Design a protein with these regions (language model features):
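Acidic/Ser-Thr/Pro-Gly-rich, low-complexity N-terminal segments
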Residues: 1-40
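Intrinsically disordered, low-complexity N-terminal regions enriched in serine/proline/glycine
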Residues: 2, 7, 64, 345-348
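Intrinsically disordered, low-complexity regions
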Residues: 9, 20, 71-75, 90, ...
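Hydrophobic single-pass membrane-targeting/anchoring helices
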Residues: 32-74
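N-terminal short leaders/motifs
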Residues: 37-47, 86-90, 333-336
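A broad, low-specificity signal for short, low-complexity segments enriched in glycine/proline
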Residues: 45-51, 92-96, 339-344
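Signal peptide-directed extracytoplasmic domains
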Residues: 66-249, 256-257
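Bacterial extracytoplasmic/cell-wall-associated proteins, especially those involved in peptidoglycan
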Residues: 188-191, 203-412
């Protein structure tokens, strides 16, 4: 910048040598041309820095986008794969989550290999939670084709309300698989040419001998379950529903997976607090729910539960045919006098009170009915319609009339 001096401004004789020699140095600097501006250079460097930063952000964003969308190069195996491996798909998982699981298990070379291949197969979005037999070192396309194949899913089975541990032979000689038999079948898978099946006998042995707490039985059920006949300790403690177990597990591991999942379901149905204010323990409510499940169709659950409460309150024997049938190899719609006369813990014609364990797997509706029965004075009921509807009575005479009606309707 130019330096100004008042004395210098008054002397205009710029060519006087004498005067020039006496001019202070600071004044001579005033004649020099102004230095070049530096602010422009600073601005240029700032702009260059900003461009570099933006470029780095763009490159990083593009790389991340490639990772998410599968654009660009990625590792991929060739072919259908080699050895078998079981992987688990959990509820709520996305395609990316499944891809990560497959990569961790060595099924695909990279998650992106599966994600890219899945884009051309809409069935991937329908993959359900559970266990799947996959091939290691498979191409992304082969892995997608494998996981959407229904034959690849293993270890899944369904338990219906009213199911029992042991299988039942119906009057027409058809066999209804019990929970133990279903678990045995669910344990089966073919892994590298070897079967993972666990025989029903091994599973039954675990029911009789395993530590119930280690199997996952809820604390509120353990004392009563341990008092039961060994083969019936888990009766009623497997809630109805769809279950997934991992083939290749031991007999005890299979039961632990099943019982633990069931305990979670029972808790979701508000057990054991559901039994509060009933006058009965949670296990007793579970027993009553199993009777309701076996004795009635859904619309009559509340009334049958009330009959149970009323008869127990009045000291009457329950006299439920379902408890007689429970211990028979071949249950019948109408039990015989001989069967009703047999001595046994589950004979509610000969014994007062509830049977020692549940006789089936009660569903949520039966549990709620057992905890909160309908209001009424009924003491008797009989199935009086072919659809399973029951007729209820408060007196023995009314009950006899209902039985005659049932016969006339061909209900039994």
């Amino acid at each position: 910048m130019t330096y100004h001096d008042s004395h210098y401004d008054e002397d205009l004789d710029l060519f006087d040598e004498a005067r020039t020699e006496k001019i202070p140095a600071v004044r001579r600097r005033g004649k020099q041309p102004p230095p070049p501006p530096r602010k422009k250079k600073r601005k240029t460097f700032v702009w260059i820095g900003m461009v570099v930063v933006l470029a780095l952000i763009a490159v990083g964003g593009y790389y991340g986008y490639k990772q998410l969308t599968g654009i660009g190069d990625y590792d991929d195996f060739a072919g259908q794969g080699k050895e078998d491996v079981i992987i688990q798909v959990k509820g709520g998982e996305s395609t990316g989550d499944i891809a990560a699981t497959l990569h961790d298990a060595g099924v695909v070379a990279s998650s992106r290999a599966f994600v890219v291949a899945a884009e051309s197969n809409a069935k991937v979005r329908g993959v359900q939670p559970g266990y799947y037999v996959m091939k290691k070192q498979a191409s992304g396309k082969a892995a997608v084709a494998k996981i959407v194949d229904p034959k690849s899913q293993v270890g899944q089975f369904d338990i219906k309300p009213g199911a029992q541990l042991e299988s039942i032979t119906q009057p027409d000689n058809t066999v209804v698989d019990g929970i133990t038999a279903k678990l045995a079948k669910a344990s089966c898978a073919d892994l590298n040419g070897k079967s993972t099946c666990v025989p029903p006998e091994q599973l039954a042995q675990v029911v009789q001998t395993a530590d119930l707490a280690k199997l996952g039985v809820p604390d509120w059920a353990i004392p009563d379950a341990n008092k039961a006949e060994p083969k019936r300790r888990l009766e009623g403690l497997i809630a109805p529903g769809v279950y997934d177990v991992k083939p290749g597990s031991t007999a005890e591991e299979l039961w632990t997976q099943l019982v633990s999942a069931s305990a979670t379901q029972l808790q979701a149905w508000n057990m054991p607090t559901l039994a509060d204010n009933t006058g009965y323990t949670p296990y007793q409510v579970l027993v009553m729910a199993s009777l309701v499940e076996k004795e009635a169709i859904t619309k009559d659950f509340g009334k049958v539960s009330r009959v149970t409460y009323n008869r127990l309150h009045d000291g009457m024997r329950l006299q439920y045919d379902s408890t007689i049938n429970y211990v028979l190899d071949r249950p019948a719609i109408r039990t015989s006098d001989a069967d009703r006369d047999k001595v046994g813990a589950y004979n509610t014609y000969g014994n007062s009170g509830l049977p020692p364990t549940p006789i089936s797997a009660p569903g949520e509706g039966a549990l709620k009915a057992a905890a909160a029965p309908e209001q009424g004075a009924w003491l008797y009921f009989v199935k009086c319609e072919k659809d399973g509807t029951s007729c209820f009575a408060t007196t023995d005479d009314e009950h006899e009339a209902n039985k005659n009606k049932a016969r006339a309707n061909g209900a039994y």
